[in-house]
């Protein structure tokens, strides 16, 4: 009888090890993962985050943009720490070494990868059904947006000013342009660094300036100086919110795509 009991316990423990984690104390080291937790209805389980995370309630800050306070993380006794590859490998190794369950999500290079990681997070915290529900809604929204695509315009999405940086292929932000049926003027480039002269030569018909600090308005006025630029003639130089545009979540992707497509019409 005891042998059967021991066998039952062993099997039960194995099944539990395969089941999703119902984490009750989560620490997020990346703003996009914090947003995803909110979309999954799990903000109440969040016990620590970075100084850049936006939350609806006050949550202990355990990290800046570049440094994680490992001691504070440990003191909060998390069931799970989620991070991106932007977190220092040494920090991840230190957390794992002391037994803190830590999962690192790689940088998403496409909308499909954003969705896959969202579903992975849902499974990880026992919210797979909610993740699937959100993804169904978002994919339906994007399908409707893509069905209205009429644009074939040359588009430039600007990320920085000094130096000038652009959205390039093989990034999730490039999918904004692709899904809108437009053409990225940086097609063929493998680095985001670009000169103003190169942009003028490619003559975009629409420019989207992603707000990062106070430079956006200045950059818009700078582009408007070039009266022969197609985007200036078309009056299609726009400023978009970096908090949404640069954050790889299914929800913010759909919101940004909708805005871009509206402005391209």
Residue ranges and their predicted role:
Residues 6-17:
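Bacterial N-terminal signal peptides
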Residues 17-23:
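Boundary at the C-terminal end of the N-terminal hydrophobic targeting segment
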Residues 24, 113-123, 130-132, 136, ...:
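Structured C-terminal subdomain patch of bacterial secreted/periplasmic proteins
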Residues 24-38, 129-180:
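Basic- and aromatic-lined ligand-binding clefts that recognize polyanionic substrates
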Residues 25-86, 103:
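A short, structured surface patch at a secondary-structure boundary
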Residues 50, 60, 170-192, 239:
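His/Asp/Glu-enriched short active-site or ligand-binding loop at hydrolase and phosphoryl-transfer sites
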Residues 55, 87, 91-120:
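Flexible loop/hinge segments that line or gate small-molecule binding clefts
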Residues 70-77, 98, 195-206:
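Short helices/loops that flank or line small-molecule/ion binding pockets
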């Amino acid at each position: 009888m005891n042998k059967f009991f021991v066998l039952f316990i062993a099997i039960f423990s194995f099944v539990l090890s395969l089941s999703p984690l119902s984490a009750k104390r989560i620490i997020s080291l990346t703003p996009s993962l914090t947003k995803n937790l909110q979309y999954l209805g799990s903000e109440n389980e969040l016990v620590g985050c970075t100084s850049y995370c936006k939350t609806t309630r006050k949550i202990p800050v355990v990290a800046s943009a570049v440094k994680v306070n490992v001691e504070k993380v440990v003191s909060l006794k998390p069931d799970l720490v989620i991070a991106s590859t932007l977190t220092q490998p040494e920090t991840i190794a230190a957390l794992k070494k002391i037994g803190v369950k830590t999962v690192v999500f790689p940088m998403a290079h496409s909308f499909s990868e954003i969705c896959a990681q969202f579903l992975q997070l849902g499974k990880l915290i026992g919210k797979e059904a909610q993740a699937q529900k959100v993804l169904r809604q978002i994919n339906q929204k994007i399908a409707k947006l893509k069905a209205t695509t009429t644009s074939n315009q040359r588009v430039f999405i600007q990320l920085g000013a000094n130096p000038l940086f652009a959205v390039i292929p093989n990034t999730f932000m490039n999918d904004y342009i692709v899904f809108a049926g437009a053409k990225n003027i940086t097609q063929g480039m493998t680095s985001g660094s670009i000169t103003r002269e190169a942009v003028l030569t490619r003559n975009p018909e629409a420019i989207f300036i992603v707000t990062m600090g106070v430079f956006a308005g200045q950059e818009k006025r700078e582009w408007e100086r070039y009266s022969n630029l197609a985007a200036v003639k078309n009056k299609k130089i726009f400023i978009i919110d970096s908090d949404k545009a640069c954050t790889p979540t299914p929800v913010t992707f759909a919101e940004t795509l909708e805005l871009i497509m509206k402005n391209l019409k």
